[in-house]
């Protein structure tokens, strides 16, 4: 699999192994002759996304096949050794491929029952899910709603790799806040690997305190600091990451058909 991974990075190699048939010209008895070459990879043109790589046979490894399938921009390799026949090695490979694809799901990045509506810079209204409530550093008690830069986005994940988690990093926000303004970053992980990352953006306006309000807030913070009281509202995460694996899974990973 590692050899295939590296080899398929070469565009010429990929072009050759993904071709099911071609004709080349050779010299034969002093004249040019056409020779038709046909791949022994029967999956090419017959299995969605099949793009190589190599059939083979050895006494110790038996009927072999290193298969590659590309879907949604990602290549999946199925390596088969010691299959029972030439035909069976392809069935073995597609069985492995199908198992992976049947356990691959579209996982929405946003899971939030709370929504908010705001007016965009073009004058249209937009209703979006609330991902977090973000603290405004200019105030002691104010937060504003935020969403993802693309709240409809999803990512394909292999469900058996484990559940998805999120890490929300909030920016220090000051000044007037307008919808669409970046106020943080949300990173999504599966099995300790980053699977998606998006900007956290404001989903409503939040004016900064005016100079008079700012003076009052400064004094209030001073007194609050002496008494150990909170001097700024805390940001909070609204979005959840439902389980996709295990007995408590809440997302259905069973595919129909």
Can you annotate each of these PLM segments?
Residues 1-257:
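Domain-terminus/edge residues, biased toward the C-terminal soluble/receptor-binding domains
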């Amino acid at each position: 699999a590692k050899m295939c991974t590296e080899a398929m990075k070469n565009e010429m190699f990929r072009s050759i192994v993904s071709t099911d048939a071609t004709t080349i010209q050779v010299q034969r008895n002093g004249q040019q002759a056409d020779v038709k070459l046909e791949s022994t990879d029967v999956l090419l043109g017959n299995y969605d996304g099949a793009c190589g790589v190599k059939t083979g046979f050895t006494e110790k490894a038996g009927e072999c096949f290193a298969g590659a399938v590309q879907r949604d921009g990602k290549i999946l390799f199925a390596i088969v050794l010691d299959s029972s026949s030439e035909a069976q090695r392809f069935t073995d490979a597609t069985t492995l491929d199908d198992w992976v694809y049947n356990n691959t799901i579209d996982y929405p990045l946003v899971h939030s029952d709370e929504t908010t509506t705001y007016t965009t810079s073009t004058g249209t209204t937009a209703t979006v899910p609330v991902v977090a409530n973000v603290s405004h550093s200019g105030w002691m008690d104010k937060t504003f709603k935020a969403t993802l830069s693309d709240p409809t986005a999803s990512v394909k994940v292999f469900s058996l790799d484990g559940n998805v988690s999120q890490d929300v990093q909030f920016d220090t926000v000051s000044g007037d806040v307008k919808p669409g303004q970046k106020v943080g970053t949300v990173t999504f992980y599966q099995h300790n690997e980053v699977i998606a990352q998006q900007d956290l953006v404001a989903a409503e306006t939040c004016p900064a305190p005016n100079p008079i309000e700012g003076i009052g807030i400064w004094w209030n913070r001073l007194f609050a600091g002496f008494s150990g009281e909170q001097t700024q509202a805390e940001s909070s995460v609204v979005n959840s990451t439902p389980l996709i694996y295990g007995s408590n899974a809440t997302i259905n990973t069973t595919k129909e058909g």
